[in-house]
Regions:
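Amphipathic, non-transmembrane alpha-helical secondary structure
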Residues: 70-81, 108-115, 119, 201, ...
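Active-site flanking residues adjacent to catalytic metal/cofactor-binding acidic residues
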Residues: 38-40, 92, 131, 171
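Active-site segments of SGNH/GDSL-like serine hydrolases
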Residues: 91-97, 118-152
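Charged helix-capping and loop-helix junction motifs
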Residues: 105-115, 149-155
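Serine-esterase "nucleophile elbow" of acetyl-processing enzymes
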Residues: 8-89
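Cell-envelope and extracellular/periplasmic
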Residues: 62-65, 92-93, 97, 101-102
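Catalytic His-Asp segment of secreted/periplasmic serine-dependent ester chemistry enzymes
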Residues: 3, 134-212
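Metal-dependent catalytic neighborhoods of phosphoester/phosphodiester hydrolases
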Residues: 49, 100-106, 133, 141
Length: 212
């Protein structure tokens, strides 16, 4: 099922509710903790670049390239709750800053969408783990957004503060991906948004340490 969002006039207003329908239906019953990585293209591309990580951990990837947080919120039940997740690791928001749906970026809206997903986790006995946005500083498909790094830092600061107040695990991938200026190093991302295999490998270690 494709759901068209009925607000704004942007280019990408589709929620791909059936993207993972077959994969979800094929999942065996969970016989232990079920960790779902949830997000956008960064999560979507992770299993392709580092399939051995998912094979060794049993983690489930449910990312969709290009999605904003509003789209992720709409498919949250199908791709997190209904597949029996016990832990949800969220990484998203850069496409909100990139205005992928064509609407102006409003930090309060993105922040509220993420908090709504945290609330859904708590209501369904799922442990939420929130990842800060990667410290991107150039969005190649939206070059007119010249302050992406500042917007990333601002949203991350709010998410980190919320997590600290409410006892939610917060993962700062910038710790292992950024240089002295706080921006992602080209050693770990060719376009400053999406990690390469080396970047994912560094993220994996921090993720596993954070889930202990």
């Amino acid at each position: 099922m494709l759901l068209t969002l009925g607000f704004g006039a942007g280019a990408q207003k589709i929620v791909h509710l059936n993207r993972y329908a077959e994969a979800n239906a094929a999942l065996p019953p969970a016989n232990g903790p079920r960790v779902v990585l949830y997000g956008d293209s960064i999560t979507d591309g992770w299993p392709r670049q580092r399939p051995e990580f998912f094979a060794s951990t049993g983690f489930i990837g449910r990312g969709i390239s290009g999605e904003e947080t509003a789209q992720m919120l709409l498919r949250f039940r199908a791709d997190v709750i209904d597949i029996g997740a016990t832990v949800m690791v969220f990484l998203g928001g850069i496409n909100d800053i990139a205005q992928n749906m064509g609407d102006p970026y409003v930090e309060d809206v993105t922040y509220a969408n993420i908090l709504s997903m945290i609330d859904l986790c708590w209501q369904n006995g799922i442990r939420p783990v929130i990842c800060g946005l990667l410290p991107s500083y150039y969005i190649r498909w939206r070059t007119e957004v010249t302050d992406s790094f500042e917007k990333v830092c601002s949203l991350n600061a709010r998410l980190k503060a919320y997590c600290e107040r409410h006892g939610v695990t917060y993962i700062d991938y910038g710790r292992v991906l950024a240089g002295p200026d706080g921006k992602i190093l080209k050693d770990y991302s060719g376009d400053t948004v999406h990690p390469n295999a080396a970047g994912y490998e560094r993220m994996e270690k921090l993720l596993l340490d954070s889930l202990k």
